[in-house]
Curated annotation (Swiss-Prot):
A motif (DDXXD motif) lies at residues 315-319. The keyword Repeat does not apply. It is an enzyme of class 4 (lyase). Keywords: Lyase, Magnesium, Manganese, Metal-binding. This is Probable sesquiterpene synthase. The gene is STPS. InterPro entries: Isoprenoid_synthase_dom_sf, Terpene_cyclase-like_1_C, Terpene_cyclase_plant_C1, Terpene_synth_N, Terpene_synth_N_sf, Terpene_synthase-like, Terpene_synthase_metal-bd, Terpenoid_cyclase/PrenylTrfase.
């Protein structure tokens, strides 16, 4: 799309010009209106009754976990079900102890467990231990390969086992060629047999081929799994009822949170003040729910969603409206971080700058109350850094400069926003977000670079065509094509290879011994999962189509039937 002329009234400090050219993107408006502003509280007696039921069912599940302590396969199946149904957070200690016991008795002491010659059982064992940070060897799958290293022919008809092996391959790390082969083998075989399978296995296979479990959002996966689990005649009725009750209670909790945030957002009137920017509060809150949905992270969600809306607007000011001179002024103001800088800004920028300072002051007050004021230094630094990155990209766009791919990535990893969002996600997480944890994060460990890479590469793959149509800075796709003289499809192939590497980096960093507390690593993993879900086939944040609408409805509109 060509740059558009905007009336000079929008930038009163440039009165010497009659018209000014701006890179307007014409982003679609919000599709939600005021839908989430009004929240009707559930009847207090009903709420209390449901909470009582949840507590009773939790005790029942705890007893079942304890009763299977010497039956590892049964215990693994219960743990798998709790995770898939979205209620593992209710049993963190029990699951931790159970998996530790299973690891010590079936791996460290090299004891066999019931089903150790069954592909499904071994793959489930491997995946659950890996997901919990235990570096078990993929050599456990050697028994399923022939003398030439190929997977045995008798596995071809074991669709359930192949599906679990397929899921297990997604927790692989570097140097595990066997799992790379297993991924290709299982994917090819499952694609060929899915149409011949019965429900619910056929549906599970289709879903997994589209969205591998390890890369999906736990709460979204739970909504999908309710009906799959219920279709199994042998399902645990107490577990399913607990999961559904808890889902609905949490959904009400989230709707109340979103209602409060929506009223705050409307009071800012950004939709009117910044009509060129994406109005995506609800999509942003969905993003945040992907990072953490658990009730104990309510403060953390309230902090990050406010900052998220600010950075989304800033991104669009740099990307879809501001002139180079205006953006230089805004960048300087952000470096000063002072309300006195307001007078130096164009009129239209002032509400955004003032709101950023207000949001940060609000967070600072909360951090002071918690004795965690040190965190604000990191929160401000990442804001300054990402804005500098936006400025670099704006200069490239203005100069029509196409950097080398390496030069592009040095800036684009920053503007992916994932170091920024990870830092902000830690602010409300309590004592585990220590100064040492923030220093670790600012050392740019491999897991962060990998998460940034997934964010940047998937974003560029899905949005570069729309962006180039409107005169956007060259994306990674264009930079790679120009530098290496390859086609667009070849560039996409290279990006897909880099995504595979990045996910292996993330998996490796999530193995014990942990460099920081596991909940902090989980935020990075979940942020990466959000990108995989929202950008799987399109830029679902900018262009909100059926997939994104359905996902939001699943988590924030439609309760599940208990």
């Amino acid at each position: 799309m060509e740059n558009q002329k905007m009336p000079i009234s929008s930038v009163p400090n440039l009165k010497d010009l009659n018209m000014i050219s701006r890179p307007i993107a014409n982003f679609p408006p919000s599709i939600w209106g005021d839908r989430f502003i009004n929240y009707t509280c559930e009847d207090e007696n009903d709420q209390t009754q449901k909470e009582r039921q949840v507590e009773e069912l939790k005790e029942q599940v705890r007893r079942e976990l304890a009763a299977t302590v010497d039956k590892p396969l049964q215990q693994l199946n219960i743990i798998d079900a709790t995770q898939r149904l979205g209620i593992a957070y209710l049993f963190e200690n029990e699951i931790e102890e159970s998996l530790k016991h299973i690891y010590l008795h079936t791996y460290v002491e090299n004891n066999c467990f019931e089903g150790s010659d069954d592909l499904y059982s071994v793959a489930l064992w491997f995946r659950l231990l890996r997901q919990n940070g235990y570096k078990v060897s993929c050599d456990v799958f050697n028994k399923f390969r022939d003398n030439e290293g190929n997977f045995k022919n008798n596995l071809m008809e074991d669709a359930k086992g192949l599906l679990e092996l397929y899921e297990a391959t997604h927790v692989s790390i570097h140097g595990e060629e066997m799992l790379d082969d297993a991924l290709e083998f299982t994917k090819t075989r499952l694609e060929s047999v899915v149409s011949h399978l019965n429900y619910p296995l056929a549906e599970q296979v289709r879903h997994a081929l589209y969205q591998p479990l390890h890369r999906g959002l736990p709460r979204l996966e739970a909504v999908y799994f309710f009906r799959i689990y219920e279709a199994h005649a042998s399902h645990n009725k107490a577990l399913l009822k607990l999961a559904k009750l808890d889902f609905n209670l949490l959904q009400s909790f989230h709707k109340k949170e979103l209602s409060d945030i929506a009223r705050w957002w409307k009071s800012l009137d950004f939709a009117a003040k910044f009509p060129f920017a994406r109005d995506r509060l609800v999509e942003g809150y969905f993003w945040v729910l992907g990072v953490y949905f658990e009730p104990q992270y309510s403060l953390a969600r309230k902090i990050i969603i406010k900052v998220f809306t600010m950075i989304s607007t800033i991104d669009d000011i740099y990307d879809a409206y501001g002139t180079l001179d205006e953006l230089k002024l805004f960048t300087k103001a952000m470096q000063r971080w002072d309300v006195g800088s307001l007078d130096q800004l164009p009129e239209y920028m002032k509400p955004c700058y003032k709101s950023i300072l207000d949001v940060y002051n609000e967070i600072e007050e909360e951090m002071a109350n918690q004795g965690s004021l040190f965190r604000m230094h990191y929160a401000k630094e990442v804001m300054k850094t990402i804005v500098e990155g936006y400025m670099d990209e704006a200069k490239w766009c203005h100069e029509k400069y196409v950097p080398t791919f390496q030069e592009y990535m040095s800036v684009a990893l920053v503007t992916s926003g994932y170091t920024f969002l990870t830092t902000i996600s830690y602010l409300g997480m309590g004592e585990i977000a220590s100064k040492e944890a923030f220093d670790w994060l600012f050392s740019h460990p491999p897991v962060i670079e990998a998460s940034e890479s997934v964010g940047r590469l998937m974003d560029d793959m899905r949005s570069h065509k729309f962006e180039q149509e409107r005169g956007h800075v060259a994306s990674g796709i264009e930079c790679y094509m120009k530098q290496y003289g390859v086609t667009e499809e070849e560039a996409h192939d290279e990006f897909r290879k880099r995504l595979v590497k990045a996910w292996k980096d993330i998996n490796e960093e999530c193995l014990r011994p942990y460099r920081v507390p596991k909940p902090l690593l989980t935020r990075i993993l979940n942020l990466t999962r959000v990108i995989d879900v929202i950008y799987k086939n399109e830029d679902g944040y900018t262009h909100v189509k059926k997939a994104m609408k359905d996902n939001i409805a699943s988590l924030l509109i439609d309760p599940v039937i208990v």
